Amino acid sequence: MPWTAPSKRSILRIKINGHKRTGRRSIVNIASFLSPKEEVTFLRDDMTIRQGLEKLKRYGYTAVPVIDAEDRYVGVVSEGDFLWNILSHNSELDTITMKSLEKLSVRDIIQSGKIRPVCIDTNMEELLGQAQMQNFVPVIDDRNVFIGIITRSEIIKYFIKKQIEVAEKQI
């Protein structure tokens, strides 16, 4: 039997049956999905454009979180942000040199607010809303300190596992 996506009704059932309840709402601790900062590729906002590009290339990501010297979340930068910034500062493509990539920092190309972080105590509904729009969701604490990311794939794996558990109980 081929796998089909869970319906909204079965997701609600999973959430209610799979977690402790308070009143009418189920609580999911989103920390269980967290990839901690120590395991996440990120850039510092004071890195040069060249350093940022090298790190993106080395790890093969198309977008990564950016933090400042105090580990506070600043935003996300993508390969597209790098490309558009390089092109806007170099009118001729053949004038792009490594030296020109040393003049600007990552903080100069960040589009703040493009990807909003969630707080570690955020509810599952808000996390799901953010994860629908991007491959990862940055997670911060109550002081805006970056503590890691939650990937959309981890959330999907969780719901698939819960859907299978529900299906097995019905057999």
Predicted feature residues:
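The conserved cystathionine-beta-synthase
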Residues: 42-60, 66-67, 116-134, 140-141, ...
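Bateman (tandem CBS) regulatory domains
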Residues: 27-40, 101-114
